[in-house]
Amino acid sequence: MENPYIKQFPDLMSGKKIMYVHGFLSSGQSGTVKMLQDLMPNATFVAEDIPVHPEEGMEMLLKLQETEKPDLIIGTSMGGMYTEMLKGTDRILVNPAFEMGNTMSSMTGKQEFQNPRKDGVNELMVTKGLIKEYRDITERCFQDITPEEQARVYGLFGDKDPLVHTFDLFHEHYPNAIRFHGEHRLIDKVAFHYLCPVIRWIDDKQNGKERPIVYIDFDALHDSYWKATSSMHKAYEMLIEYYNVYIVASAPTNDHEYMAKVQTWVEVYLSTPAYNHILFTNQKNLLYGDYFIDPHPAEDFMGTTIEYGSDEFKTFEEIVTFFDRLGGQ
């Protein structure tokens, strides 16, 4: 149900089904499911309690995938580990715990579930035997990965995650390894700013949708001290909801470090939504798109140029107003 009091994306995954795979000591009644439902009110969510023993858990999830035929599967932590093995469906793994045996090694003894389960069980004993079961199941990850599967899977990794560190392991097998600003849990801020843009890419691909292209010159994003310009984040967040946004920077032949500096800046200030959305070129006029926000527009750009810093567009606030009036056109 749409809620006028919170920011939502009613068009995102509209009419589609999302399967959520929860983490260790959680359940299908996790607050994360409600949070995602609030963000995408016109999507249907499927989330079930995963059995404690991993063999049973994997069997249940495979049956659920076959029965429900979800359009997208999102798994967090332990659920991310399971989700990697649910082949044939578009998938997002958030801080996937591919090394569950090591992660659980400090958790031996009685543990309480963080969310209510349908079976009424509220605690479990973590034993060496259970840890071995999880270590064994993780050895099945990353098997028989085809190019088609690589294109279906995205991994999101918090740059401040204190529990799981599997970015490099994931990236050995899948190209779409993306960092975000956050810790281990999928909180609302992370879902809104980082998860939803990735879901939008997947949704567009499934729908065969091509959004209008907006280029933003890198020099419009930062000041002389390389700090973000006023209202830049506000404008960027608004634009990525409706447009395919690319950052354009120069590629100085005699300064190779500049490109690395730009990539680092974009990762720090824009993060996940800008993944694979940076273009380096010394010939901006050759780019083909719909709009170009640029302090020094190319005269022969085959689209609409917006001169950032001009009397008409002094700041990004004026640019927000301009695009708001366009309504995503």
Predicted features along the sequence, with ranges:
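Charged phosphate-binding loop/patch that engages nucleotide di/tri-phosphates or the phosphate backbone
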Residues: 3-7, 19, 176-211, 304-329
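Short, hydrophobic beta-strand segments that form beta-sheet elements in well-ordered domains
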Residues: 71-75, 91-93, 153-159, 278-280, ...
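Gly/Ala-rich beta-loop-alpha elbow adjacent to hydrolase catalytic centers
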Residues: 74-84
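Asp-based phosphoryl-transfer active-site loop
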Residues: 208-226
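C-terminal cap/substrate-recognition subdomain and adjoining C-terminal extension
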Residues: 256-329
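Short, acidic loop-to-helix structural element flanking the phosphoryl-transfer center
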Residues: 222-246
